[in-house]
Amino acid sequence: MKKLWLLLSVATFTGFIAPGPAVKTVKEDKTLLLTQLQQTRDNLLKDVQGLTDAQLEYKTAPDRWSVIECVEHVTLIEKAIMEGEQHLVQQPANPERRKDIKATDEQIIKGVEDRSHKVKAPEFGVPKHNYSSNAEAIKNFTESRNKLIEYVTNTNDDLRNHVMDHPVLGPIDAYQLLLLDAAHTNRHTQQLEEVKADPGFPK
């Protein structure tokens, strides 16, 4: 869980606006979560479709990430979040803590997607270029996300009644943890779109 805590406290919510009062309505269906996971997957894949290796590897500056590095980072963070998710749902359910949750689903999504707050990725989330090809990196993301979507679709885990303490937001549930993952994907899809919009991006 140490990796997950570092991720949550450093990589995603630095600068997050203090949440408002808790929303009492609990969405037990999976519609929002599945929509977020599917849409952010599809948007990322659409943005990288048809790009050449030169385009995928282009950097706006030596210390900035390329498109393919954004993809690898998203995959690394998703795997860390899934490790934390599985650990969380294997613990005894604690529905009595639902009353302590302050952050709404919408606040989590908007807070992570906001790129006006620049943050440094944890070391385990920094791209390592461990793939034999750019196509393999994209395939790895696709397989990881499809596996996560399959889990959400088929699981009987009570995601809303497994609550963990977030170092910034306070208590959040296992459902919200996966919303965080989808929003993180969108955050870096925005980043790779900025790379593609750079005047020096290969044609």
Model-identified regions with their sequence ranges:
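Short, helix-capping/interhelical loops that line the mouth of catalytic, cofactor-
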Residues: 15-32, 83-139, 172, 199-203
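A charged, solvent-exposed segment within the mature domains of Sec-exported extracytoplasmic proteins
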Residues: 115-181
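Short, contiguous alpha-helical
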Residues: 58-107, 154, 158-203
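Sec-dependent N-terminal signal peptides
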Residues: 6-11
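Positively charged n-region of N-terminal signal peptides that target proteins for export
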Residues: 1-4
